[in-house]
Amino acid sequence: MSTLVTCSLPGAVTTHASTRRFGGSQFQTSQASCISFKREVSAKAVLRSVRCNATQTQSAQRKSSTATVKRSDPKGKIQGPKLDDGSGGFPPFRFGKGGGGGGGGGGGSNYFGGFLLFTCVLLLDYLKEFEKNLIARRQRAGYDANNDMFQQ
């Protein structure tokens, strides 16, 4: 519900009053939207006019809301946040089906991530040994070839 109210002064003050409802309570607000003068009028007279319009509006009653705070634990014990006990559950970062469990105790029966890491380290160690043996064979073969050239 909105009304348009004008004031009778040498100039005109147009106010826009609107009524709003919030949770069963009714509020009415007034806002000056346009002030125009044909002659010079003191600012004091304009303010009196606006005050008059504001007092002529309907008074609003505000219902106070009450809130009841209920304790979650009737015995008064304070509960802290739930911490991870290391049992199953989703880890923070889960790649595939494995991944090492959820942050706390290691992961329980889900050991695929550790097995994969161990396998990769074992493979790299094997490749390192294989490369050492390959280099040693080449050096021996090259040394033997050089000796044969000098003997002929």
UniProtKB/Swiss-Prot annotation:
Main location: mitochondrion
Localization annotation: Mitochondrion
Presequence boundaries: 1-52
Biased composition, class Polar residues, residue ranges: 52-69
Keywords for this protein: Mitochondrion, Transit peptide
A GO-annotated cellular component: mitochondrion
Its biological purpose: Restores fertility in rice varieties with LD-type cytoplasmic male sterility (CMS). CMS is caused by genetic incompatibility between nuclei and mitochondria within male reproductive organs. Corresponds to the functional allele of RF2, which is dependent of the presence of Ile-78 in the japonica cultivars Fukuyama and Owarihatamochi (AC F1SZ42), and indica cultivar Kasalath (AC F1SZ41).
Listed name of the protein: Protein FERTILITY RESTORER RF2, mitochondrial
Native source organism of the sequence: Oryza sativa subsp. indica (Rice)
